[in-house]
Amino acid sequence: MITAASLLTALAVFIARLCDVCLGTIRHVMIIRGRRLLAFSVAFFEAVIWVYAVSRVIGAVSDPVTSLAFALGFASGTYAGITLEGVFKIGEQVVRVFTREGGPVACTLRDAGFRVTVFDGQGRDGVVNLLFVQVRRRQAGEVARIARNVDPECYMVVDDIRKTYTVGG
């Protein structure tokens, strides 16, 4: 029989699982980005919440509503974690722009405040320029928009950066 107490327990389990799985997704991002201390801190809270959720499910093992809330919280936490990671856009990326209009694209990007390194290359149909632009993840879309405005035929590749090293002064 479903009671108000069992519904409250199920709701608490759902919220706990949503939070701990969401934190787990963020923790994985921090690990990939090399942010050890932040990953450590998130892992601590993730584990505390997980223990709470599991203890509630074990305490109500005969209640299918609580078990369903556990599973639904897991699925919802996965979705929420991915969504949050996309909103926060933590980290840096390198945008590589392949273009025949390297000079104008580089100048426009530099005028917008981006640092651009230009290389010459040989493509299938002749000489191309390869532009490297390192940006915060939230700026990658702006770089792509600027490059496309100058050269609608350009081709871009965007990669996540784990670490960067500065040499010299």
From Swiss-Prot:
Which CDD domains would you find in this protein's record? Answer: YitT_C_like_1
Origin: domain of life = Bacteria
From the Swiss-Prot or TrEMBL record, state where the protein is found: Cell membrane
What cystine pairs are annotated?
Answer: none
Claim: Transmembrane is one of the keywords in the record: yes
User: What is stated as this protein's family in its record?
Assistant: Belongs to the UPF0316 family.
Official protein name in the record:
UPF0316 protein Dde_2502
